[in-house]
Amino acid sequence: MKNFKNQNFQKENLNLSFSQKRKKFSGKIGICFFEYNFFQKNFHVQNFPIKKCRLLAQVSEQTPQISSFRQTSNFTPNLIKKKLLNGYSKIHELKLVTIELASPEKIKAWAEKELPNGKIFGEVTNANTFHYRTFKPSKGGLFCEHIFGPLKDFECACGKRQRPSALESRKILEHQKTSRYFCPNCDVEYTWSIIRRYQLGYIKLNAPVTHLWYFKTNPSYLSILFDMKRRHLESIIYCTETITIENTWKYSQQTSILNRSPKDLYLTWQKFFTLEEQLQQYNRIYQNKHQHQKQRKLEFRNLSILQNKISPQINWKNFDQQIVEKNQNNSVFAKNFQTFENIETFGLKRKHSIFENISMQKQKKFGTYFFEEIWKIILQKSYKNSFLFLNSQECFSEHFFQNIYRISNIFLFSSKKIQKFLKFHEIFIFGNTESLNKTILELKNKKRTVNFFSKDFTPFFIDQNVFESHNSLKIKKQYWKSFFFLFEFTRFFLSKKNTKIQNLNVLSKKDFLFLVNLIPFLKKLALFQNLQVFKKNTKKSHAFYIQNLSKKNKSLKKKIFLKKNLFTEQNLISFQNQVQKNKIFSVEPNFSEKIFSTFFSNDFLNSNQTFEFNLFNLFFDVSLNFGKILAFLKLYYEIDFCSFVQKHSFDFEKNYSFKNSFSTKQFELFSNQSTLVSMYETVFFDYFSFFFHFLKIFKFSNFNMSNSVSLEFLNDSEKENIFYSQNFRTQKNFFFSLKALSFLLVGFNYENKQNLLSDPFDSGFEIFPNQNSVFMTQNFFSSKLFFKEKKQKKNNSKKLKKQLEIFISNKPLLSRQNFTERKKQIQNKKVQKFFDFDSMTENFECSFSSEKKFKLFQKKVSNSSLQLTQIQKKFKEPFLYKFIKQKNQKKKKFNNFHVFLSTKANSNLFFFEKKQKQQIQEKFQKMEKNHFLQNSILTIAYNYLWNNDADWKYFIYYNSLFFYEFEDHPIFLYRSLSPIKDTKNNQAFMFSDTNSSAIKFGQSFSSFLSWSIDDLPKNFFVGAGILEKLLTEYTSSELRKMTKQHQILLPKINQMLRFLKQNAKTKKDSLKIQKYFQKREQIIRRLKFLRKFSRRNSNPTFMILKNLPVLPPDLRPILKLQNQIAASDLNRFYQRIIYRNDRLKKFAKDSATNQSFEIKYAQRLLQEAVDNLIQNGKGSVKAETNSRGQPLKSLSEILKGKQGRFRQYLLGKRVDYSGRSVIVVGPELKLYECGLPKEMALELFLPFLIQYILQNKLAQTVVGAKNLLKSDSNLTLHLLHKVIKNIPILLNRAPTLHRLGFQAFLPKLIEGRAILLHPMVCPSFNADFDGDQMAVHIPLTVEARTEAWKFMLATNNLMNSATGEAIILPSQDMVLGCYYLTLDFQSKFVGVQLSNLLKKQNSFFPFSKPTYLGKEKTFQIQGKNFEKFGIQNKAFLLFSNFLSVLNAYQRKEISLHTPVWVKWNSNVDFGNEFSKPVEIRLQINGSWEEIQPKYTTFYNYKNKQLQKIIRTTPGRILMNFMIQQCSMS
């Protein structure tokens, strides 16, 4: 056997070859849109090319895997292969085919292929097939070579040929992964043309379409799932009826002008937010509690003020509802808005205790109830996303939370209306209170740490003289700005809405909810830049202006430069009268305003009217361009919903370094000989903004020692104090802005100084390939962009330029998955960072610590340009710069920035070297161990889905009132621009001045700019789109609920049916029972369907088609036959679908028809076209016909039936070593045997016979062996018996519906031409002996035979694999036995004989008259009459009971089928109780007899039954006894 295997069967290349190696096959069938996964651990096609094995199914092979080896990593593939080839073991098993619904993405993945150049092909876009002259496939058509492969082997559309090498060809045949080659010109793959037989394409449908097999079958699956009648479902699908919900959905799809009046906006939002109703119960319960808490709070405040523990202003009295009502004059408000310096008088421990105590109070007050009740309501009512606007930038400043967190931590407000939502902001903005307190305690041993709390924060409009005139004061934040403006704006808004409102200081809960929802409204209007509105309308804001704009120092006439008003220049200039006349207001056009200027009316941008008037006009301008702007900002749908929080802790704020900016060569940017002017700009990023909120100029605080002592003579500690207390307050703001996600460097042209900025056209992308960062530089070169100092000389007044640097980390942002983890981590006193500051500073160091100049400053500045003393020149390269270099060499990440101190006398620079070295090192260690550092990007995962799309539309609308703020450039650049590389100079350009899409970009960015509103995905709420919308509600959890509901409902219906059956009396009750039966059947059917969906976690929406597979072109060919074109009918179907799909797209684009009846009709035509492709003419749809009027063959006709693709070509293929014949019964066979005709066996086993003859040298050649077999029949029969002894055969009966349709048998040679089969095997094959045919196959290899013996032998397949029940049962034998026992074949003969006998006796009553003996009334028959009645063989006998019959049978006096008469007075079922009697006899005494064919009944004159004699057989009596014994047992 070993030689036999090695010579012939080791590498067989046949269809039925098997091996022990398990392969995974994954096939896709286009018409069914099912996915088949066939895990076959025992079989695989060994060397046979996969392309020859599949026709409709696409098979992708993967690496062999065995479940037992998955846990062991030491096994190599070769070792696994050796293990598998050694023999069989328990790990070999056969898994069944699994079928599941194919998603639209899966269908798309089947067809698409991506080229190395990034192009993707697979979608069929036009209906063209071949060119009528050249007969070449049309590009993008139904026979396109890009999609389906080349027409000739390894030849592209250009005519170029590129065949693979022999090694690559071998790898391809062995299914090993090889690189694919494409033509660079025509993008056609170099491969075999046979791929056109397997490569699918797809058509992207512009509207969803329902699959025909799911709603026109019986039962209709969609109608079961929706619990809807099939005719109603079809009317929705074919757009003949309109459901109510359709109009609701359509309304949400309208992107036309929204109502812009304040009243309509207010009412619209009121519909979506009904939190007021749900909070009523809470307010009733806690009303008394709140009042009590308020009273205790006032007592605590008064007590604290009396004990001088805390300043009155800390409690934010301006927000207290009662105090606001009492104080209505300007002076009180101005007093309330004064600076809060009193807290500085306390020690650090006192501050810590205050923070801790009040934090505990707040947490106790709001923590428990907020998270249990309010937070749930917020999530339910879509408050989650609206409340995110309360994070960070609603406070309109990146520095606000740094200060408010340190100074007052939790002292935010005392208004009852606002406190309800405090805990939310505490978590998402402030982090954890204890972390702050730890940070404060770390500084308790430092000298003058109070100065850290005194960082001067500039208000919205600040006079820079504040730092000189009030230098001794520690100016704090005046209030929480976001809620202040929120409060004020609501007052203004409500006053416009209702002029009757008098007291606007008290807001109702409903107004407050509206106020909270208008936070994006407020933010987008940038009200902090348009405060004149509030000045005109509220006293409070007027007092605020007086507070912040009245501080001035008349002795020093300096300039403050304010940013231009967001909308009009005139607004800001008109405000000039409120400030000093010597102040200059610069005009700075907004960057985003410049980009999106095409979206807004020029009249509005150039308007001279005030902001108050134009407030709601902007709504109209934006709404007109809503769709265009939304399309332009496509990436909004792709990015997470982001908010940017920029803050840091105390220890780190001086470490946010932009190191190279303070080298001595670049110090010129910030210093001047005559006056020291430090100009810096703090940049804030709102959610989707790119404009600059503040532009501020600060004077350095001129340091004058009171004793006129020179600074050089100060000791180290005093130097340190000066460093911290004086300059650090202003300088750290600048460096913190450099740390931000995006930063600005502002350059100025002073006297006798050259322009330091680079050429404006040298901007672009500056890529550092060795770093994990990308810097995008952008130049602005317009005289309007920047302000200029008027003191400059006229000749040297040049255009000022500004460059924008954007730092982008390549690390991923926060994913949706760990968003919930982030909330927990914040509560656990940690802030998770998306990219940490460590890596960012490292990138900064690597980028800017090089010796050559930074790109901003291309011209070097010599030391002579600065008037430096000798001491300064010694410290030309400061110590901290050296220290940073050392840190870089050690690969440490944090660095310190350079500080300098300016004096009024000259421009002396002092760098402290002695004291700080050790101190800085200690701080680095602290920062590395325990730091509370929030990154500048806070990404909130947006994963909430509104139930109604209208909510989403209004959400977009309210959060993008000014769409030039809607775009988020940092994320935008992170997603789109970071992979862009220009091969020439690594540069990219961002936007032009006028048209943002006019400049050349990389591929991905240009596609973004060219994206139009036509590409915006729309939901078609007509036809199948309605069903798709409904199916989205059938989530896995919802399906499980429905399943459980039906399981509960079913027993109740059964109980109701039992009750109705017991009490049914009228016909109405019967009808009711019938209805309940129908309802039960419907519930059972629906329950089975729902249970399958819920258990498999299948998505019901996959029953709706969005992508339609296109069969490979070789399965629907177009051929030239004798100068004529022969085309497959499928091409006509696909063309019709493409035409109607384009028609629907045309209607959908046009706003005049996208909601009209035309689009409904177009949807119906598309649905009918797809239906005809799947099954032509099914139901009421008109069938597609050819020119002769004959219906075209659809996919169903091609696949189903005996002439279909499966049974005709796949299952019915002609194969070698096979035969076919009629089966007849062979009851004498054993279960595993079959009778094989000698003639067929000789033909099938001929190769084996020849091989045996040649091996035993009975003949020398094959011809000689054949002659020997023909000449000697006895030898042939002898050899044939020997050969078939160990070779099983496989029998198959079509159709092969399950694996038991193929079974192995041991052949037994018989005479004749029919195959003998054991009758008990018939149920497995679903066969009978009425002319059925079966096919015979011979397994060739040793492996195949072994598996045939082990797995496929008939005796090994006794159970049904699907149900687990026995499939080989003696059912026919039992039926035959029962039939034989109850057979009455002699009845006719007995009846004739009995009638003849009676005629001979001349008496119809052979017995004597019955006599009645008393009450017993027994019927006696005289024994002498038996002799007259006797017949030969005792054929006609009368027995008194059944036992006497059985005794006669045992004595062999009668047989099983002998008719006998037996007296029997019990009930007997003859099956024809009400048939007409054969005869009725009347006696003289009034008694009578009723004679039936099988029994006779005797009655007395009172019609009372006396006796019954039945005719039966002993076999039937035996059967009756057996049934009674079974029932008793």
UniProtKB/Swiss-Prot annotation:
Mg(2+) binds at D1328, D1330, D1332. It comes from the Eukaryota. Its cofactor is Mg(2+); Zn(2+). It catalyses: RNA(n) + a ribonucleoside 5'-triphosphate = RNA(n+1) + diphosphate. GO terms for molecular function: DNA binding; DNA-directed RNA polymerase activity; magnesium ion binding; zinc ion binding. One of its GO terms (cellular component) is mitochondrion. Zn(2+) binds at C156, C158, C183, C186. It is found in: Plastid, Chloroplast. It holds the Pfam family RNA_pol_Rpb1_1. GO terms for biological process: DNA-templated transcription. Its EC number is 2.7.7.6. Keywords: Chloroplast, DNA-directed RNA polymerase, Magnesium, Metal-binding, Nucleotidyltransferase, Plastid, Transcription, Transferase, Zinc. PANTHER family: DNA-DIRECTED RNA POLYMERASE (PTHR19376), DNA-DIRECTED RNA POLYMERASE SUBUNIT BETA (PTHR19376:SF54). In plastids the minimal PEP RNA polymerase catalytic core is composed of four subunits: alpha, beta, beta', and beta''. When a (nuclear-encoded) sigma factor is associated with the core the holoenzyme is formed, which can initiate transcription. Belongs to the RNA polymerase beta' chain family. RpoC1 subfamily. DNA-dependent RNA polymerase catalyzes the transcription of DNA into RNA using the four ribonucleoside triphosphates as substrates. This is DNA-directed RNA polymerase subunit beta'. It comes from Tetradesmus obliquus (Green alga).
